[in-house]
UniProtKB/Swiss-Prot annotation:
InterPro entries for the chain: FA_synthesis (IPR003664), Phospholipid_synth_PlsX-like (IPR012281)
Similarity remark: Belongs to the PlsX family.
Record's keyword terms, sorted: Cytoplasm, Lipid biosynthesis, Lipid metabolism, Phospholipid biosynthesis, Phospholipid metabolism, Transferase
Annotated compartments: Cytoplasm
Pathway: Lipid metabolism; phospholipid metabolism
Name the UniProt record assigns to this protein: Phosphate acyltransferase
Keyword Lipid biosynthesis: yes
Coarse class of the protein's main subcellular location: cytoplasm
Length: 316
């Protein structure tokens, strides 16, 4: 299957050249596979700098943009930049010129532009950022981790359905289980919205819903899908990443290599904007090196698996 991936070189915490070099590393690692190609989106200045500084004979195509979305741009400001690298990349995705689009840039802008340009599944009220995290039993899926700060119980139900569809379409669990991220395991814990969500999830999924789950229990692997609002989910994810970075810093070489591989969040692909009819991947703004390499590689695998089409089919 031929796969063409688009990537925004602009807007992240690192220089566009850092992202470009990782892109070339991915290309070289898959040199024997002629069915994979890339299109990069960057400002004219960055494109000229790349073409004058690198001698790679088989460059990915670079589409020059008039502007780019900065990390501190509001969603409205991003929409007004109609010829930004992010907007052009999403236009290419909308027009089926690429099979997936990756960005390390402004999350709110990416979500807003994606919703404006890419159709949402008919049964989905709001897309959610979906990630995989390592657990003692393999990995779990958690959503939302930052697309929606405030959501209602019906939207949380939609997240659960998308997470279930994602797990099923990738064949990760025959009978996936669901948990609601909360401040305690008791049914009455949390806000009124959490209590309503608990009741809806229980009525909908019955035995597959195992109730509330505390953040510290996620890594035990007690559930396959963790449902959260974007505010709580984002704090959980960034705390988990910070703890791993802290352990790696203080333990260094004392951390066994197999343990490191199991705990290392950088081996997992970036966050999928789940609920869109086409594949959009948000990598961490500070992603570089291995984490970005794996984010790009994971996007290739998801595109090949036609994950969006399979999730839509499962939801239908």
């Amino acid at each position: 299957m031929n796969v063409q991936i688009g990537i925004d070189l602009m807007g992240g915490d690192h220089s566009p050249l850092v992202i470009w070099e990782v892109l070339i590393d991915v290309l070289n690692s898959r040199a024997s596979n002629s069915h994979i190609s890339f299109i990069a989106f960057a400002s004219r200045e960055v494109k000229e700098q790349i073409l004058s500084s690198y001698t790679h004979k088989e460059y990915p195509e670079i589409i020059a943009s008039e502007s780019f979305v900065a990390m501190d741009d509001s969603p409205l400001a991003a929409i007004r930049k109609k010829s930004s690298s992010m907007a052009l990349g999403l236009d290419y995705l909308k027009e089926d010129k690429i099979d997936a689009f990756i960005s390390t840039g402004n999350t709110a802008a990416l979500i807003t532009l994606s919703r404006a340009k890419i159709p949402v599944f008919p049964t989905v009220r709001r897309p959610a950022l979906l990630v995989r995290v390592p657990t003692m039993r393999g990995c779990a899926v958690i959503l939302d981790v930052g697309a929606n700060v405030s959501v209602n119980p019906e939207e949380m139900l939609g997240f659960a359905r998308m997470g279930l569809a994602y797990r099923q379409c990738l064949g990760k669990a025959e009978c996936p289980t669901i948990g609601l991220l909360n401040i305690g395991s008791e049914e009455r814990k949390g806000t009124e919205a959490h209590r309503q969500t608990y009741r809806i999830l229980k009525e909908t999924f019955q035995d597959a819903f195992l109730g509330n789950i505390e953040s510290g229990d996620v890594f035990g692997g007690s559930v396959d899908i963790v449902v959260a609002d974007g505010f709580t989910g984002n704090i959980f994810l960034k705390t988990a990443e910070g703890v791993f970075d802290f352990l790696r810093h203080i333990l260094g070489d004392k951390l066994e290599s197999d343990v490191t591989r199991h705990l290392d969040y950088t081996i997992y692909p970036g966050s999928m904007v789940c609920g869109l009819s086409k594949l959009v991947i948000k990598c961490h703004g500070k992603a570089c090196g291995k984490s970005l390499f794996n984010g790009i590689s994971g996007s290739i695998d998801l595109a090949r698996a036609r994950v969006c089409e399979r999730i839509l089919s499962s939801l239908s």
